[in-house]
UniProtKB/Swiss-Prot annotation:
Primary subcellular site in the record, as a coarse category: cytoplasm
GO CC field: ciliary basal body; cytoplasm
Similarity comment text for this entry: Belongs to the BBOF1 family.
Annotated coiled-coil segments of the chain: 27-175, 245-386
Entry keywords, A to Z: Cell projection, Cilium, Coiled coil, Cytoplasm, Cytoskeleton
Pfam families with a match to the protein in the record: DUF4515 (PF14988)
Annotated Polar residues bias: 479-492
Protein name, as recorded: Basal body-orientation factor 1
Gene Ontology BP annotations: motile cilium assembly
Signal peptide (UniProt feature, chain positions): none
Length: 520
């Protein structure tokens, strides 16, 4: 029993020491956490101080930007006022030139209508006379063509007759020669066939007799080997007999073909005789027709001579009357030439006016194209610099030296609240001009482009809506524009004659609305 108690006491002492060590560890952890919280609090306090300082700096920058914006709006107002004066002067000049051109064009139209009316009267009078002469000439030429056609028919009949006679003679000669040749070839073929048949029969008889004698002698001399030689000789004789039989059949076929050819030649001969009879009858009828046509030709030649004499007399009379009318026509031509000279002078004046207007338009177009190129280059440079700055700030924030900037996009996202494209679009607005004196060089390229587009619109009489704060533009030493202060009235519906009078959709590089001007 006492041993067990001693063991129990030893265990109790061990447990008490473990609890004390745990309390010391928890107190050390709590102190370390307190130190961390203090360090974090000091860090956040430093961040708050830095943020407050940056907020104050941003506020000062915003005030400076607002002041600069107000100055730019004032500059814009002055620029618009100067531009309106320029446009009013150009419009007055353009209106005067347009009125002069319209008056000259109206006079030109009257002169053209008068000359065209006089010309139409002369043309109608002469056309009536020409139509009468042409009708008479058509009648006479129709009669003459009919006579020529009948003469050609007679000549054609004569040629046909000579050709038919020559063909008939050649056919007769050919038929005679073909008949003679056919008879001779038929006789030769029959003779050859008869002689060949006799020769073959004689050769066969001789061969048979020779073979019979030879077989008899050989049968007597060599009765043992006689059977084999007789068989071979018999085979050879049979082959020779077959050959002669085939040759005889071929000669029979040749005889049949020659007989058919002879019958066809006989039929051809009969046909040629019938054709000869028909040709003779046709030639006789042609002889009678030729005699009739010859008599008719003589009468037509006499009538043609009479008609040609009458036509010559009428032609002489028409030439005499045309000579009288030519004097009147020359006087009208001289008057028309004088009118044309006057019209050419008017055209030259109008052309010079148009050239002056075109030079002004080309100057505006070149300036607008230059502004658009500069806008494109400036926007590209701004995007690159903004992206570079944004990446640098992100790298600094990752390193812990700066705060993380706002998320910024560079791809013109539709739902983005901080995109570079919106800043580029804001540079096109006019609300940053507040000063009373603004130089053209102080404007952005976007504002210069908008100003040039507005000049195009004002030059062509396009009305623009009013702006709430119209700025003014002051000319610099290098870009001064001086015009009279009184503004001319806008033209409601100008004619689409010049380059600058195209629609604004074809002239502007972006779809934004032009800024409005306040009427002075």
């Amino acid at each position: 029993m006492p041993k067990k108690k001693g063991k129990g006491k030893g265990k109790g002492k061990g447990k008490g020491k473990g609890k004390k060590d745990g309390k010391h560890d928890s107190k050390a952890d709590r102190e370390s956490e307190i130190e961390k919280l203090k360090s974090n609090a000091s860090l956040w306090e430093a961040k708050f101080t830095v943020t407050d300082i940056s907020r104050l700096e941003y506020r000062e920058a915003a005030r400076a930007l607002a002041k600069a914006n107000e100055e730019l709006e004032n500059q814009q107002y002055r620029a618009e006022k100067d531009t309106k004066d320029i446009i009013a002067f150009l419009k007055r000049t353009d209106f005067e030139k347009t009125a002069t051109i319209a008056a000259l064009e109206e006079e030109l139209k009257r002169e053209r209508a008068k000359s065209a009316q006089e010309k139409d009267l002369l043309v109608a009078e002469y056309m009536q006379k020409i139509d009468a002469l042409e009708e008479m000439f058509r009648q006479r030429s129709g009669d003459f063509q009919r006579m020529q056609g009948e003469l050609k028919t007679i000549k054609h009949y004569r040629k046909i007759k000579a050709n038919l006679e020559e063909d008939l003679i050649s056919i007769r000669e050919k038929m005679y020669v073909d008949g003679r040749a056919h008879q001779e070839s038929l006789a030769r073929t029959e003779y050859k066939f008869y002689m060949a048949r006799i020769r073959i029969e004689k050769e066969a008889e001789q061969k048979i007799s020779q073979l019979a004698e030879q077989a008899h002698y050989e049968a007597v001399d060599q009765l043992g080997a006689a059977s084999q030689t007789v068989i071979t000789e018999n085979i050879r004789l049979n082959e020779g007999l077959d050959y002669h039989v085939k040759e005889a059949e071929q000669l029979k076929r040749i005889n049949v073909a020659l007989t058919e050819k002879n019958s066809s030649l006989a039929l051809f001969k009969e046909t040629n005789e019938l054709m000869k009879k028909e040709a003779d009858s046709h030639v006789q009828s042609q002889h009678s027709e030729i005699s009739e046509l010859t008599a008719k030709l003589s009468t037509l030649e006499q009538a043609l001579g009479i008609m040609s004499r009458e036509f010559e007399q009428e032609r002489v009379e028409m030439e005499r009357s045309a000579g009288v009318n030519n004097t009147e026509l020359e006087e009208l031509e001289m008057l028309l030439a004088a009118r044309e000279k006057e019209l050419s002078k008017v055209k030259q004046l109008a052309q010079s006016i148009i050239e002056q207007r075109r030079e002004l338009e080309l100057f505006f177009h070149e300036a607008l194209n230059h502004a658009r190129k500069e806008i494109k280059a400036q926007q590209q440079h701004y995007r690159q610099e903004a992206l570079k700055s944004y990446r640098w700030r992100m790298n600094e924030a990752h390193a812990g030296r700066l705060e993380f900037p706002r998320i910024r996009t560079f791809s013109n996202a539709p739902n983005s609240t901080n995109d570079v494209q919106t800043e580029l679009e804001d540079s096109d607005k006019w609300n940053n001009l507040r000063s009373s004196n603004v130089d053209i060089s102080d404007l952005t390229w976007e504002q210069k482009e908008r100003l040039l587009n507005l000049l195009f619109a004002k030059l062509n009489g396009i009305k623009t809506r009013k702006a709430a704060h119209p700025p003014a533009l002051s000319a610099s030493s290098s870009e001064k524009i001086q015009v009279s202060s009184d503004a001319g009235s806008t033209v409601e519906s100008p004619s689409m004659t010049f380059i600058t009078q195209m629609t604004m959709a074809n002239m502007t590089s972006d779809p934004f609305v032009l800024p409005a001007l306040k009427s002075t």
